[in-house]
Amino acid sequence: MDITRLTIKEARKLLDNREISALELTRTYLDRINTLDGKVESYLSVTEDMALKQAEQAQNLIDYGKASLLTGIPLSIKDNICIEGTKTTCASKMLEDFVSPYTATAVDKLFADNAVILGKTNLDEFAMGGSTENSAFKITKNPFDLTRVPGGSSGGSAACVSASLALGSLGSDTGGSVRQPASFCGVVGMKPTYGLVSRYGLVAFASSFDQIGPIAKTVEDCAIILDSICGNDPKDATSLKYENDSSYSSSVSGDIKGFKFGLPKEYLTEGLNAEVKESLYKSIDKLESMGAKIEEFSMPVLKHAVPAYYLMSSAEASSNLSRYDGVKYGYRADNCKSFNELIGKSRAEGFGKEVKRRILLGTYSLASGYYDAYYKKALKLRTLISNGFNEAFTKYDVVLHPTTPETAFKIGQNSNSPLAMYLADIYTVAVNIAGLPSISLPCGYDSNGLPIGLSFTGKPLGEKDIFRAAASFEAEFSDKFRVPAI
């Protein structure tokens, strides 16, 4: 069994045909984590005892013919998603010793399908960043080049799937945090429509943007995970009441003949790497040869997406993170002589540089005298961006675009340049602003052998359209999934 090319669908066949047991499969992944994760550093914690127990329970169900598609499948969870009785650190000193008293709804749904959870993966602190360098505990490396970043903030999840240290993973996407690392690590990452997956148990960064999404090796594997975790949840007020008439995994079949794709001209301007652009146009040629129609269109408001996103998300973060004060829970500073000193010192020592930067930006934009000048304008831009996409979807089935303007950069390259780091999300943040579904999958490799990602974005609740488009392209893409040489 070549674990480096194994997919969820293939593992399901092996398990159901009794060619391997759930316990053997789980131990294979745990052994690989023990051997290789010292190089990649994708995991913050490995839940070995829990995984082995879950594998035993899964095998019992398989033996009785009661397995779901995810029964016995080893997965990982980003460490800002809660699992009862395990640490949820958000890669922050502030929550270094926090043990979650409850389990996120999305994880509960995986438990209900008897998936096996191998551990919690690394991220940028509180999911704020695009390189996973902002973690308080370790820097995750890109499996394709250990001197480069895996992307972020779900860099640990993308790297562990790319390195075959799990068959799939749950990440969170606030401004591209599932899709951008998936692009950098050569795997598939999917952000669902806002509200399709419950946010209950996801530690909040920016509540009107945050969304849990799957990362896996194939489009179909992502669809299988989404089938498990989606659905209405009364514990989340923003959860959609949406009745799905068929599974997402069933939508990966069928061709795209006659599909109309729109390509925003604003994503083809200065700043787009030449090799990424070349790969994009080769992908367009491939889609056209499959019977699809591709047309460039203009959406001028997209040039304002990055500043609007960082203003709004930072404002929400400054509110959400105000709860961490060293009193009820979280890091508490020593030798404080007053209550005010306790709060100030605890937050100063508990939060990292990037988190502090965004709290300051958010607090500033919400302050009296600046609210109208900055935050209110950003809200207006949100409406304009949503309207722009709505208009585009009257003409096109799917919007097509690069996932990132460049391939994975060197560790430390952008550490002292917040603007350069923010611009890595230039093609992804508008999707979160509008609450749309989007999927990134590999479409090529640059001259250094680094993966390039292509994104398909759909209308609200248009997951089936983007799964169909992505799966059709994936089936024709000659290179498909490359195995990183680690």
Swiss-Prot record:
EC number: 6.3.5.7
Domain of life (superkingdom): Bacteria
Keyword line: ATP-binding, Ligase, Nucleotide-binding, Protein biosynthesis
Record Gene3D superfamilies: Amidase signature (AS) domain (3.90.1300.10)
An MF annotation (GO) of this entry: ATP binding
GO cellular component, one term: glutamyl-tRNA(Gln) amidotransferase complex
Family under the similarity heading: Belongs to the amidase family. GatA subfamily.
Role summary: Allows the formation of correctly charged Gln-tRNA(Gln) through the transamidation of misacylated Glu-tRNA(Gln) in organisms which lack glutaminyl-tRNA synthetase. The reaction takes place in the presence of glutamine and ATP through an activated gamma-phospho-Glu-tRNA(Gln).
Quaternary structure, from the entry: Heterotrimer of A, B and C subunits.
Protein name, entry field: Glutamyl-tRNA(Gln) amidotransferase subunit A
Species whose genome carries this gene: Ruminiclostridium cellulolyticum (strain ATCC 35319 / DSM 5812 / JCM 6584 / H10) (Clostridium cellulolyticum)
